[in-house]
């Protein structure tokens, strides 16, 4: 077990020895490890690059490539959204007026919500998370399209399957759903891995505490 000091507080680390990734942070979106309970924004995967913080089957960020096309970086939208993490391989885009809000959604995503798309079988992303409470958790996400056989892993041990219960019929037709319930028996800094296959646009994972445990 390793102790870290974050913002003056001592935090235990359960992160596997030898992991070289570090929590995502920049001046706009995020400062350090994401918290559980709380929302894990999937675009905020760790720094560290291919094979460490993520695995993608090609080197291009296909979301940024698309958003370089005419009409895809919408008027008034900052480049920090249109071309988020443009030089990395994970494929990230954002919700747009003419693609995501020009039809009824069962649940509307946030305007300019970043999401991971263009997924291929065997890809994954890593997240340094700070687990505040041991307990039973409900996991909720907002997604478009259909189930893609995702799984969540904690410190290289499988935590749960992620089951997207409904086929929305389109990558840009969004709904929100409970996709798993699981028990987390660790606190402090931990390594959360999302492994996914082709089939869905995924925006975030909300970890909602059902019941704390000792």
Predicted regions, residues:
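Extracytoplasmic
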Residues: 14-214
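Bacterial Sec-dependent N-terminal signal peptides
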Residues: 1-14
């Amino acid at each position: 077990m390793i102790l870290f000091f974050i913002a003056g507080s001592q935090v235990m680390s359960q992160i596997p020895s030898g992991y070289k990734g570090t929590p995502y942070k920049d001046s706009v979106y995020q400062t350090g490890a994401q918290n559980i309970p709380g929302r894990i924004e999937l675009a905020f995967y760790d720094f560290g690059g291919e094979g460490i913080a993520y695995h993608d089957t090609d080197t291009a960020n296909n979301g940024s490539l698309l958003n370089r096309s005419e009409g895809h970086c919408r008027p008034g939208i900052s480049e920090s959204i249109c071309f988020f993490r443009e030089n990395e391989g994970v494929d990230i885009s954002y919700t747009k007026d003419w693609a995501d809000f020009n039809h009824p959604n069962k649940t509307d995503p946030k305007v300019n919500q970043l999401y991971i798309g263009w997924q291929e079988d065997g890809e994954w992303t890593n997240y340094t998370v700070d687990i505040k409470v041991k307990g039973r958790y409900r996991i909720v996400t907002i997604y478009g399209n259909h189930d893609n056989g995702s799984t969540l892993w904690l410190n290289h041990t499988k935590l749960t399957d992620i089951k997207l219960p409904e086929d929305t019929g389109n990558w840009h037709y969004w709904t929100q759903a409970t996709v798993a319930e699981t028990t987390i028996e660790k606190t402090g800094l931990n390594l959360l891995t999302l492994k996914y296959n082709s089939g869905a646009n995924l925006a975030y994972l909300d970890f909602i505490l059902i019941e704390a445990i000792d």
